[in-house]
């Protein structure tokens, strides 16, 4: 028998699922809170200029509620910091923080509507695919998803079907109704 040896992982995050990763894609992203935010800039502040952020972030003078910081809003920078988590608990449970843009919503729709598609190919196309094609149609729906595109595999097959079928096997057309003749007045 082969011997199995156990090796400790190189990191605590190896083999675990990560939802938010840092810029290096190696470990979970941990936000940092900057303690001294009274001044932001590269050089020292000139005495005559106003750059004190406490002055800029002061509450309104009419005793209204203070404006919320950016980290207090869901899905903003720093919103999952444990110190401010009391704001986010209800939003996290509802899934409100997940924002779907146009492309991600389209991809979700294509996945969730895969087995709800009412379209089916015509019977002669299924017959050309061989035995058991009708029975396995629901399990191979992804092969039929792009039939509306011009160069998909099955669109080409349907085009070849239409051009190569003899006239007798094409579905019959309904006869045209005779046109009514107008009566002439003498």
Curated annotation (Swiss-Prot):
Q: Which InterPro entries match?
A: DUF4562
Compositional bias annotation for Basic residues: 176-186
Which portions of the sequence form the region Disordered? Answer: 163-186
Name the chain's protein.
Protein SPMIP2
* Source organism of this protein record: Homo sapiens (Human)
Task: Give the encoding gene's name.
Answer: SPMIP2
